[in-house]
A protein has these predicted regions:
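Active-site neighborhood of divalent metal-dependent phosphoester bond hydrolases
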Residues: 45-125, 140, 144-149
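N-terminal active-site segment of His-dependent metallophosphoesterases
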Residues: 1-55
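Active-site-proximal beta-strand elements of phosphoester/diester hydrolases
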Residues: 10-17, 124-130, 174-176
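Divalent metal-coordination and catalytic microenvironments
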Residues: 15, 41, 70-71, 112, ...
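A general structural motif
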Residues: 7-9, 33-34, 62-64, 122, ...
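A short acidic-Thr-Gly-centered motif at the start of a beta-strand
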Residues: 1-6, 28, 57-60, 117-120, ...
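Active-site environment of divalent metal-dependent phosphoester hydrolases
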Residues: 17-22, 44-47, 72-78, 119, ...
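Acidic, His/Gly-rich catalytic cores of divalent-metal-dependent hydrolytic chemistry
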Residues: 5, 149-226
Length: 226
């Protein structure tokens, strides 16, 4: 295990999406006394969803981690709370619901409902996708509108939500989702030092291509990791 650092820092971890093995490997690479910020979308997609949720919650209860809400957690909350046929159909297509079953999902519901939307650090903030460029409230689905209009008012914003081949930097924005569930990496970024730590993500027999999303990198680029 990496030694405890003299001054605890923060590590913002990208979308885990049920990749429990990668998450454990990443934990071994991070200083034991530092704070972990799970940047939402810990559930769905990967092969070990319940193990991922349980492990993260253990860290939350120990006071070591903060689990932020992502759009996948929000969708599950809304589907479990609703009774419409559209929401029941949404549950039927939810990986977490299929893996855990209705009883276990409902046991998790209150915890998920209390997940915060953002974590505010000293000169930086972590949130799942960004902020609405009109209200400047956390938005779990925003992409281009935030990337193009964020003016640095909150300092550096560290987000997940949009996967890419490496941790990317835009003006005042750092994007830490590196596609662990697509055969990419699971990455952690330290806002205090701008250091990146990454481990291999899921290695499926047939790798899934990253979603075809374009990220405006002309004013930024990759952040080297170790």
């Amino acid at each position: 295990m990496t030694p405890v650092s003299s001054r605890p820092r923060h590590w913002v971890i990208g979308d885990v999406h049920g990749c429990a093995d990668s998450f454990e490997q990443l934990l071994k690479r991070l200083p034991a006394g530092d704070r972990l910020i799970i940047c939402g979308d810990a559930i769905n997609r990967g092969p070990a969803i319940e193990a991922t949720m349980t492990r993260i919650w253990e860290l939350v209860e120990q006071g070591r981690a903060v689990w932020l809400r992502g759009n996948h957690e929000q969708d599950l909350i809304q589907a479990l709370r609703g009774g419409s046929w559209q929401q029941q159909r949404q549950l039927a297509g939810c990986d977490t619901f299929r893996h855990l079953g209705e009883t276990n999902c409902r046991r998790w519901l209150e915890r998920l409902e209390h997940l915060p939307l953002a974590y505010w650090g000293d000169g930086w903030v972590a949130t799942h996708a960004g902020f609405d460029p009109v209200s400047w409230q956390p938005d779990l689905r925003v992409r281009m509108g935030f990337w193009q209009h964020y003016d640095g008012r909150f300092g550096e914003v560290v987000i997940g939500h949009t996967p890419g081949p490496h941790v990317r930097r835009l003006p005042h924005i750092v994007m830490v989702d590196t596609g662990a569930c697509y055969g990419g990496e699971l990455s952690a970024y330290c806002p205090e030092t701008r250091e990146v730590v990454a481990v291999p993500g899921l290695r499926p027999e047939t790798p899934r291509a990253l979603p075809g999303l374009r990220t405006p990198l002309s004013s930024g680029g990759a952040i080297a990791g170790r």
